Design a protein with these regions (language model features):
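Short coil/loop residues immediately preceding or within conserved phosphate-binding loops
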Residues: 40, 109, 122
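Structured loop/turn residues at beta-strand edges in well-structured enzyme cores
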Residues: 38, 104, 120
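Amphipathic alpha-helical regulatory segments at dimerization interfaces
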Residues: 16, 29-37, 75, 79, ...
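Regulatory sensory and allosteric helical modules in signal-transduction proteins
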Residues: 11, 41-42, 48-58, 63-107
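A short, aliphatic-rich beta-strand micro-motif
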Residues: 107-118
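Helix-loop-beta substructure at the N-terminus of cytosolic sensory domains
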Residues: 20-53, 68
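Signal-transmission linkers at sensory-effector interfaces
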Residues: 1-24
């Protein structure tokens, strides 16, 4: 895949007009299924805009968004591959993240990029 610049990615994200919309049953079902399959306490469907990570669906995490620089998803959207961080305390990308060093003390992360037909990675 050729690299898409950040402005192109954001333009495509905004065209979907999904940011800050209410929760939707379809997304909630996907998150619930992921929680069941992977037996994890937290499942998020997130989108990354210029400054934040916004959650279209969230199970086990009550915050509607986080700053982009705290988003593990920010790493996920850099590749077409699934990102797995086995120990967030020891991974250089996440060890100093406030979500690792403080509440909710994230230790494990797995995320798959959400990729549009235009090959824009919008979130995870």
């Amino acid at each position: 895949m050729s690299e898409m610049d950040e402005q192109q990615r954001l333009d495509i994200l905004y065209q979907y007009e999904i940011l800050d919309t209410p929760r939707e049953h379809a997304f909630e079902r996907i998150a619930a299924l992921a929680k069941l399959i992977f037996d994890v306490p937290v499942v998020l469907i997130s989108l990354i805009d210029e400054n934040r990570q916004w959650f279209k669906s969230a199970i086990g995490f009550d915050t509607p968004e986080t700053p982009r620089d705290h988003a593990f998803c920010n790493e996920t959207i850099r590749s077409d591959e699934v990102l797995v961080i086995s120990n967030a305390e020891q991974d250089l990308r996440t060890a100093k993240n406030p979500l690792v060093t403080g509440e909710p003390f994230i230790r494990f992360y797995a995320g798959a990029p959400l990729i549009t037909p235009e090959q824009a990675r919008l979130g995870s």
